[in-house]
From Swiss-Prot:
Name under which the protein is recorded: Non-structural glycoprotein 4
Bilayer topology term: Single-pass type III membrane protein
GO molecular function (one): toxin activity
Purpose: Plays an essential role in the virus replication cycle by acting as a viroporin. Creates a pore in the host endoplasmic reticulum and as a consequence releases Ca(2+) in the cytoplasm of infected cell. In turn, high levels of cytoplasmic calcium trigger membrane trafficking and transport of viral ER-associated proteins to viroplasms, sites of viral genome replication and immature particle assembly.
Organism this protein belongs to: Rotavirus A (strain RVA/Human/United States/M/1976/G3P[X]) (RV-A)
Subcellular location: Host rough endoplasmic reticulum membrane; Host membrane, Host caveola; Secreted
Cytoplasmic compartment segments: 52-175
BP GO annotations: monoatomic ion transmembrane transport; symbiont-mediated activation of host autophagy; viral process
Pfam family, one: Rota_NSP4
Subunit and interaction comment: Homotetramer. Interacts with the immature particle in the viroplasm. Interacts with host CAV1, early and late in infection. Interacts with host integrin ITGA1/ITGB1 heterodimer. Interacts with host integrin ITGA2/ITGB1 heterodimer. Interaction with microtubules blocks trafficking to the Golgi apparatus.
Length: 175
């Protein structure tokens, strides 16, 4: 475990790889050498970083399958990014989380639509009642018996002794 995390050991392995590549490929003008060296360096770094991480994670975690799956998916995604692909590998857990988030958002929007629809229906009913109250209804005969000034009116024939009881008998003036 100490050798895996030792920086000097890692650097010496990288130097050994570079020396080996230089001895294998004698032509210094080879165009693909930097690319091959960088890919091998990245692979070696991934190897050195992933093994201790997986060992620690497997010891501390109860679910080793998920840890291994997550590490492998991360390594594959890193390699895809290095190769220039924009696509990524996702696990079922990530897909289920995204689906749950989408379903939750859809439920929230449906509740909002339901509330708005209920409010609109209530407003339409209120407008209908207001419209019904404002409609002028044609009436053929107007019933004047309910008018306040028509209740106690008597005609000249109905008055006692033919005199108007509302006319004053005497005129009094103040001095």
């Amino acid at each position: 475990m100490d050798k895996l995390a030792d920086l000097n050991y890692t650097l010496s392995v990288i130097t050994l790889m570079n020396d080996t590549l230089h001895s294998i490929i004698q032509d210094p003008g080879m165009a693909y050498f930097p690319y091959i060296a960088s890919v091998l360096t990245v692979l070696f770094t991934l190897h050195k970083a992933s093994i201790p991480t997986m060992k620690i994670a497997l010891k501390t975690s109860k679910c080793s399958y998920k840890v291994i799956k997550c590490c492998i998916v991360t390594i594959i995604n890193t390699l895809l990014k290095l190769a220039g692909y924009k696509e990524q590998v996702t696990t079922k857990d990530e897909i289920e989380q995204q689906m749950d988030r989408i379903i939750k958002e859809m439920r929230r929007q449906l509740e909002m639509i339901d509330k708005l629809t209920t409010r609109e229906i209530e407003q339409v009913e209120l407008l209908k009642r207001i419209h019904d109250n404002l409609i002028i209804k044609p009436v053929d005969v107007i019933d004047m018996s309910k008018e306040f000034n028509q209740k106690n009116i008597k005609t000249l024939d109905e008055w006692e002794s033919g005199k108007n009881p509302y006319e004053p008998l005497e005129v009094t003036a103040s001095m």
